[in-house]
Amino acid sequence: MIEIRFHGRGGQGAVTAANILAEAAFLEGKYVQAFPFFGVERRGAPVTAFTRIDEKPIRIKTQIYEPDIVVVLDPSLLETVDVTAGLKEEGIVIINTEKSKDEILEKLKKKPKKLALVDATTIALETLGLPITNTAILGAVAKATGLVNIESVEKAIKDTFSGELGEKNAKAAREAFEKTEIFEV
């Protein structure tokens, strides 16, 4: 089973990203589970969401404490949240940032096996006109992990958002897929 933990802020779409990733994996015939963790969050407060993907039915119902993959939608969270808490030894960290690999590694408490960086904010602003990075970051997830193919991500996005909004969000994911930089750490 692959366990993914998303870190974002309220209103950024971390929960939607977790759900779309699950939908993309489901489209490929996998078993999935996606759910948010809500405390007293409000818009702008840190939010966590989770996705599990497996080849067999998923029976566990807990939060993800030891993720295989961590996805960070808002790089400012690196200053206040230990996003790598519990990350498995072979873990992958995917971050929306314009910063360099070295700048990001300085901020991580635990070094991942693989680090993927993409400026999803700029992609979202150029494609959608809004700094909502949830669909763009899924392109980076597809590229860095190989868990799902980009076509399944695009279809899941279009199933979630209809019409022009779906097309633009799918375009953002594809662009992020193409622009994601991956580093073995």
From Swiss-Prot:
It catalyses: 2 oxidized [2Fe-2S]-[ferredoxin] + pyruvate + CoA = 2 reduced [2Fe-2S]-[ferredoxin] + acetyl-CoA + CO2 + H(+); 3-methyl-2-oxobutanoate + 2 oxidized [2Fe-2S]-[ferredoxin] + CoA = 2-methylpropanoyl-CoA + 2 reduced [2Fe-2S]-[ferredoxin] + CO2 + H(+). Heterotetramer of one alpha, one beta, one delta and one gamma chain. Keywords: Oxidoreductase. This is Pyruvate/ketoisovalerate oxidoreductases common subunit gamma. InterPro entries: Oxidoreductase_gamma_subunit, PorC_KorC, Pyrv/ketoisovalerate_OxRed_cat, Pyrv_flavodox_OxRed_cen. It comes from Pyrococcus horikoshii (strain ATCC 700860 / DSM 12428 / JCM 9974 / NBRC 100139 / OT-3). It is an enzyme of class 1 (oxidoreductase). One of its GO terms (molecular function) is pyruvate synthase activity. NCBIfam families: PorC_KorC, PRK08534.1, PRK14029.1. Its EC number is 1.2.7.1, 1.2.7.7.
